Amino acid sequence: LKKSILTLCGMVENAVADAVDAVMTSDRKKAEAVIDNDIEIDHFELDVEEECLKILALHQPVAGDLRYVIACLKMNNDLERIGDLAVNIAKRALSFYSIPTAEMPVNLRPLCECTKNALGKSLDALIRLDADLAAAGLAYDDVIDEMNRENHAKLLGLMHQHPENVERYLNLLNVSRHLE
């Protein structure tokens, strides 16, 4: 079960990183790959859920083991949802295909890195059953929220200054929100 959750996490982390990279570089192929690969994440999520349900049905875990399997079920669902958010980001990237990267008004890479770090620490906490690691993952939340607020404020200002680019700025706002 641990190996399956780690594999799914790796798939999702790659999808998020590739989706953000597609936005930042207007890389159409990378965006399309993220969208196409989502079916693999969806299938893997179903496999992990089935594995968890088999453990519950066949082994009837109790106490700590039961909590662990339930936590894996929840994490599995959350990872699939994050994969779907990566697809949403990739779809936004397709709208930037014709925009030169030098004109990107916000840098989403730091937000992406913080999000990946928070996700990684949270997963490590689950796998190792480590409350300190869980707290370290939560510590990123305020930083991520602040980065999203900064992007939001900057993009709203740009919308007022350049109303002809409102759709583009709204797409970037959504990307930032999805990362948050």
Feature names for model-found ranges:
Residues 1-180:
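Cytosolic, long alpha-helical scaffolding segments
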